Structures are given as structure tokens and as C-alpha cells.
Swiss-Prot record:
The keyword Disulfide bond applies. Belongs to the long (4 C-C) scorpion toxin superfamily. Sodium channel inhibitor family. Beta subfamily. The lineage of its organism: Eukaryota, Metazoa, Ecdysozoa, Arthropoda, Chelicerata. This is Neurotoxin E1x. One of its GO terms (molecular function) is toxin activity.
Length: 86
């Protein structure tokens, strides 16, 4: 029983360590902007939305940075997107 608990705990830790992270993007392929660096309610809320699926978000380099994202979530920079430029 203890072995099963230990294996389960290890899998949870590995999943957390290997989770994707990065800057959120808008429809133009740009980083979602933020102005209050560090802990930021807006970024945390955006990262945790159901369609995003992140575990935590904060403002870093004036962009919303998310941790614990699923692989399906797009992060900045996007290939073939120039952030609204032609």
C-alpha cells in the first residue's frame, strides 16, 4: 500500500515539473499585456480559465506568464504569427 502511494506521489510531482509554461497570447499572436509586475489577479485569472487550463499566472516582463499549462495551450511566440505586423 505504501508503495502505491509513493508511486502516485512521484507521478504527480513529475507531471507538475514537466508541465508547460509560457506567455499567454491573444488572437493576433501577441503576449497578453499586464502592468502590475509580480502577483497579478488578472494574469492568474486568465491562466486558470477552463479553456487555458493553467495552474498559476503572474505578470513577468509586462506579459501574463502561466505555469502548469496543458500542451494544447498556445504560448508566445507563435510560429508564423508576427503579433499584428505584416
Amino acid at each position: 500500500m505504501n508503495s502505491l502511494l509513493m508511486i502516485t506521489a512521484c507521478l504527480v510531482v513529475i507531471g507538475t515539473v514537466w508541465a508547460k509554461e509560457g506567455y499567454l497570447v491573444d488572437v493576433k499572436g501577441c503576449k497578453k499585456n499586464c502592468w502590475k509586475l509580480g502577483d497579478n489577479d488578472y494574469c492568474n485569472r486568465e491562466c486558470k480559465w477552463k479553456h487555458i487550463g493553467g495552474s498559476y499566472g503572474y505578470c513577468y516582463g509586462f506579459g501574463c506568464y502561466c505555469e502548469g499549462l496543458p500542451d494544447s495551450t498556445q504560448t508566445w511566440p507563435l510560429p508564423n504569427k508576427t503579433c499584428g505586423k505584416k
